């Protein structure tokens, strides 16, 4: 009996060691794998940053490599407008059809949440355009955007301090409801939707978005860069749609076929008819 016990105990020890090794290998990293954010003090650049925004320098190369090669969750530090960093666990989460993802491997999207407070969550993407994020942090919605003049220059700002386009470029229509009434209605609908979401299965809607030649040129002139801009747009829409409506938007596999690079040959006239198609 003693001899059998001596054989069994080492076997149990080996089995436990194997189990703990597997669990350790499956566990997400606890420490941030990217922390390279430093505040920029350039007066010229700060003057063009959003009010109360935070201008930062980074090295996008290691961050891009980390995210493009990630097959499982990674942890990175993201800059907050108040001057601090928060560690977020990012998990690959696509907003494009698999075929489109395979065709443009330099574009990846992620869902993520803060390690210290999982209620703070949002979505992030990496592409040739850089790193972009939109996430909830406490009572604020925070954005991280790349500045156009430098691949390694970024700004972190809250929604209330977002940069606003010139009013001259924004034709305005008379509101059908008073702002206070509309705000109360939206808050009520959002609250009701969040209560129902736990009982609702997430639905995916396939989406096709065309881009004019002007849009593509504005974002760098290539289909990949225009698609990357559309991916950032859809990724951010999904922050709201998934939370409030249990809806996931996904760009179709052939979406790049309707991204045009030349304003002179695209099928859009940029007249009121085109505007009607977008309303």
Specify the residue positions occupied by each region the protein language model found.
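Bacterial N-terminal signal peptides
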Residues: 11-22
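Fold-level signature of zinc-dependent metallopeptidase catalytic domains
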Residues: 28-56, 153-279
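Bacterial N-terminal signal peptides that target proteins for export
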Residues: 2-13
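N-terminal prosegments of processed precursors
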Residues: 25-152, 273-279
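Intrinsic-disorder/low-complexity regions
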Residues: 3-5, 144, 160
């Amino acid at each position: 009996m003693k001899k059998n016990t001596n054989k069994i105990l080492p076997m149990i020890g080996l089995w436990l060691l194997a189990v703990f090794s597997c669990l350790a290998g499956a566990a997400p990293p606890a420490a941030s794998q990217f922390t390279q954010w430093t505040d920029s003090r350039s007066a010229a650049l700060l003057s063009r940053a959003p009010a109360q925004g935070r201008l930062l320098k980074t090295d996008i190369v290691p961050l891009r490599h980390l995210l493009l090669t990630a097959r499982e969750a990674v942890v990175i530090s993201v800059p907050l407008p108040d001057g601090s960093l928060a560690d977020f666990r990012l998990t690959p989460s696509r907003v494009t059809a698999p075929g489109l993802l395979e065709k443009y491997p330099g574009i990846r999207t992620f869902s993520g949440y803060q390690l210290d407070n999982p209620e703070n969550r949002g979505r992030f993407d990496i592409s040739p355009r850089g790193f972009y994020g939109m996430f909830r942090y406490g009572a604020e919605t925070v954005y991280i955007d790349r500045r156009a003049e430098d691949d390694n220059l970024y700004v972190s700002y809250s929604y209330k301090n977002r940069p606003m386009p010139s009013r001259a470029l924004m034709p305005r229509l008379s509101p059908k409801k008073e702002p206070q009434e509309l705000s109360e209605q939206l808050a009520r609908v959002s609250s009701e939707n969040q209560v129902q979401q736990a009982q609702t299965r997430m639905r995916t809607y396939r989406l096709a978005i065309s881009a004019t030649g002007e849009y593509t040129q504005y974002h760098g002139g290539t289909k990949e860069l225009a698609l990357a801009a559309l991916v950032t747009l859809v990724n951010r829409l999904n922050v709201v749609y998934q939370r409030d409506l249990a809806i996931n938007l996904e760009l179709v596999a052939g979406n790049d076929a309707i991204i045009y690079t030349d304003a002179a040959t695209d099928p859009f006239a940029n007249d009121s008819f085109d505007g009607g198609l977008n309303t």
